[in-house]
Every structure is written in C-alpha cells, then in structure tokens.
C-alpha cells in the first residue's frame, strides 16, 4: 500500500476520514456556540465594570458618544480572542494533555498482560476497518477504560492496570470493542474536544487557586480578589462546556454498547465488564470530573455512589439499564450475568498457582551462605545473597529476575504497581500466616522492626548495576523492609517478602 493510499474499509465502520471531516464541522459549531456564550458573558462583565466606574465618578457612560460602538468592538475582540485560544488549545494539545495527566504509558511488550491488550486492540481495529489505533495503559489499580483522539489525529484506547488484572480475555475484548466503537462512530473525536475545552478552564482555575503561604502576606488580598473573579468565571465556563459533554454523550454509550456487540459478538462479556467496572473503584488519576464522559463507566471512588450513572449530571446511562439491554441481546437476564461473574471468580481462585513459603520448599533449611554471600561487590547479574546467577522469570505476567537457590527477586520499581494490581497467584496458608505475623509485629512496634532490619542486613550489591543496596521500607503505608537500589530504581526482595507485600495489599483492598 502506498503512503497516500487509504486502507480498505471494514464492513463495520464508515470511512474514517469522512468521520474526521464531520467531527471537524461539529467542532466548528461548538466554537460558534462558545463564541456566542463569551460575547454574552464578557459583555455582562464589561457593562458591570463600566457601570461601577461611572457610579464612582457620578456619571454613567451609556449616553457618551460612541459608547455602544466601543462596547461591541471590545466585547467581540475579547470574546473572539479567548474562544480562538481555547479552541486552538483543545485541538492542538487536548488529547495529549489528558493522556499526560492520566500518566498513560505505551504497553510493555515483555509484559504478558500488556501484550494481550496490544493484540486485542489490533484485532478489534482490523474488524472495525480503522487505519490505526494506539494502545495505552494507565498505571492505576482502578477499573476503567477510555477512548480519545491524540494531537496528530490518531485514535487511542487506554485501560487501567486494574482492568487488565481483573478482566477475562472476552471481557477485555468487549471493552476494547466498546472504545473502538466510540472511535468508529466519531464520538471519541467530539468528546475529546469537549473535555479538552473544559480542561482549558481547569488549568485557569489552578493558576488562580489561593496559595496558603501567600495568603498571610500583606498586600495580596486585592490580587487574590481579582483572581477569585477570574476563577469563578472559569468555573462557570467549565460547567457550561461540561454540560454540553453530558448532553451529547449519555445516549452515545448505549449506541456504543450495541456497536461493540457487533464487533465483539459477546453482549454478555460486555455486560460483565460494565458491571465489574461499576462495582469496583473506577476513579482514575488525579483530575476533576470534566473527563468523565470519556470513560466506559463514570469515575467514582466507591461502588454504589450516585455517579454510577443515570442521575443528572452523569454523562452515562444507568448501569442497570445498560446491563438490561445487553442481557436482552444475549437472551439472558442481568441476574444470570451477575451469577456468572461470581462463578468465574470462584473458578479463577481455584485455578491460581499457589506459592508456598520458603520454609515449606526447603523444609526449614536456612538459606545457603558461602564465603562471598552478602559481600558487596561490583559484580552484576548475581544474587546479592548467594552470589549465584539470577534467572529470568515471569511473576504475575511481569518480567523479573529470580535466584533459584534462595528465591530472592529483583524487580524494577516501575512495574510494582502492575504486580500489586494482579491476583493470578495464590498463597499457601503458611504464607498467609507469615504475612499476618509480620503485620501484627509491625503494628506493635514498626520502629523496632526497622532497627532490627538495619542491624541484621549485610552490605549487598545491586545485581543490575553493582551499586550498593540500601535497606528501606517498601513505602510508609506498607512498612515491609526491602533493599532498594537508589541508582537504577530496582528493589531486591528476599524470599517471601514480595508475596507478603501482595497478601497485605490484597487484604487492604478487600477491606
């Protein structure tokens, strides 16, 4: 195929380039509405300002020669400038800024879960007849997904680590089909534009948020008062644009669900995916609700909150309504689908590979220690305890390096969120008891536990770079003692430490 040739269209999707043209026309219509709103809003602000100035001088300016000509010229110029600036920002940087704010990353092909996502996006893209769709992963334990359009016009589908960890293959395919249906129908173009327009005001609000340190400085109140006016106007404008997103997106979710069934051929899988996302924590990243229309379910911190859809101003129909429609397509009932979710969860628990503790594997034998064991040296690729070569392995689908003798693990700090989000590994009762004993000891005296670690830890070298490992807690929420390389951002877990961390995290999430 030549560079200038268009790819052949699939049966499902209309011409992708025609969709882009139609959405361009729609975005111009939004620009016209925005300009009209600004003319009205700025006109009111200008009139209020001039009236206040005239009242102070004892003479209102409305009867002055040429007043209304100046008024309309100033109003139109300011409105056109702000509307064009916002429109240009949304078209040029909107999608990229949203991805950056959500900390989206390209899939790691060495990660089995990420590779499955990339392959699934490619399969559904081909079925839809789209020229190109990028895949992204959001480093978040929440369960959600979205579709948007990047600055260069390329569509993108992003899913969270929590979704990859919790969803079966057919559920991942159904969610991907839903997001690609939004792209093929043109929804993603328009919603990305609307959310980016609202995001413009969000950034203005952040600029004028009061600084608590400056609040006590004399002479700053007037500046803060002016900033408050601007921030209030920005908040109102953001609300207006967000309401437009709500109005255009609510029914589009139902249409995208139907189109996803045509692409993925599994209405039950999509219903399961929507229910699981709604029942889970689906709040993604650190952002306000202006991005809500982009997601498959409205971002929320807990299940059962009003944001679950259907209530104003939600951009999504009620989850119960969506499940009822999909259940009807699958010739079943929502109750049967929920029961199927529970059955699949039990099957998954039974299929877990159960990891024993180090003591169970070695029948209580101590870890081997030779004359070089624990000695700090610059040699790389060797276990810092046994001085034996490390082997490549997959742990929760993530590449790690393992010592086959002492069962220590070297893990890149960047992949820890993936490991802790996933639950394909089970743990023996002995490991669970070991984790509980650790939690109880830590609760009684965490500082004593850290001092004990510092006393017994011997100098050790990072197997990746040779830099000296430093004894540190994993973090200050999970005070598990590990050894971190401050040079290459890797963590060395001795036998059972990573498993204990996973057990504690899973118990915390279950609470």
Model-derived features: positions:
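Transmembrane alpha-helices and immediately adjacent membrane-cytoplasm interface residues
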Residues: 67-98, 113, 122, 126, ...
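Peri-catalytic and regulatory segments of divalent metal-dependent proteins
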Residues: 6-8, 87-192, 196, 285-286, ...
């Amino acid at each position: 195929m030549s560079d200038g040739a268009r790819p052949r269209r699939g049966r499902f999707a209309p011409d992708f380039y025609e969709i882009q043209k139609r959405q361009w026309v729609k975005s111009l219509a939004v620009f016209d509405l925005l300009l009209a709103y600004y003319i009205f809003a700025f006109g009111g602000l200008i009139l209020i300002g001039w009236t206040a100035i005239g009242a102070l001088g004892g003479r209102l300016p409305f009867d002055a020669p040429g007043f209304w000509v100046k008024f309309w010229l100033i109003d139109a110029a300011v409105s056109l400038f702000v509307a064009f600036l916002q429109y240009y920002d949304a078209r040029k940087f909107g999608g990229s800024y949203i991805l950056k704010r959500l900390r989206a990353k390209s899939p790691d092909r060495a990660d089995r879960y990420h590779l499955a996502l990339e392959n699934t996006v490619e399969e559904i893209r081909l079925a839809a007849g789209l020229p190109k769709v990028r895949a992204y992963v959001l480093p978040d334990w929440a369960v959600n997904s979205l579709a948007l359009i990047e600055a260069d016009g390329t569509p993108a589908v992003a899913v969270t680590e929590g979704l990859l960890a919790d969803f079966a293959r057919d559920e991942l395919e159904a969610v991907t089909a839903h997001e690609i249906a939004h792209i093929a129908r043109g929804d993603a173009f328009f919603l990305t534009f609307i959310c980016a327009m609202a995001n413009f005001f969000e950034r203005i609000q952040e600029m004028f948020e009061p600084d608590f340190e400056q609040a006590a400085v004399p002479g700053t109140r007037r500046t803060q008062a002016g900033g408050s006016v601007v921030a209030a106007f920005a908040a109102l404008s953001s609300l207006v644009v967000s309401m437009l997103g709500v109005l255009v997106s609510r029914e589009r979710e139902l249409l995208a669900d139907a189109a996803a069934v045509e692409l993925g051929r599994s209405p039950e899988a999509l219903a399961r995916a929507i229910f699981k996302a709604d029942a889970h924590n689906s709040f993604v990243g650190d952002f306000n609700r202006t991005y809500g229309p982009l997601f498959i379910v409205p971002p929320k911190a807990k299940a059962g909150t009003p944001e679950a859809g259907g209530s104003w101003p939600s951009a999504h129909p009620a989850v119960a309504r969506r499940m009822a429609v999909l259940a009807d397509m699958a010739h079943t009932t929502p109750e049967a689908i929920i029961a199927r979710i529970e059955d699949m969860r039990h099957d998954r628990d039974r299929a877990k590979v159960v990891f024993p503790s180090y003591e169970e594997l070695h029948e209580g034998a101590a870890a081997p220690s030779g004359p070089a064991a624990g000695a700090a040296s610059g040699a790389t690729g060797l276990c810092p305890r046994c001085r034996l070569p490390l082997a490549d392995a997959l742990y929760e689908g993530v590449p790690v390096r393992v010592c086959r003798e002492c069962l220590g693990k070297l893990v890149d700090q960047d992949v820890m969120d993936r490991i802790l989000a996933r639950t394909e590994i089970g743990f023996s009762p002995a490991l669970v008891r070991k984790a509980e004993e650790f939690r109880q000891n830590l609760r009684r005296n965490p500082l004593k536990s850290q001092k004990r670690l510092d006393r017994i830890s011997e100098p050790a070298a990072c197997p990746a770079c040779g830099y000296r490992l430093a004894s540190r807690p994993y973090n200050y929420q999970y005070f598990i003692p590990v050894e971190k390389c401050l040079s290459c951002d890797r963590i060395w877990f001795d036998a059972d430490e990573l498993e204990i961390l996973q057990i504690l995290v899973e118990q915390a999430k279950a609470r």
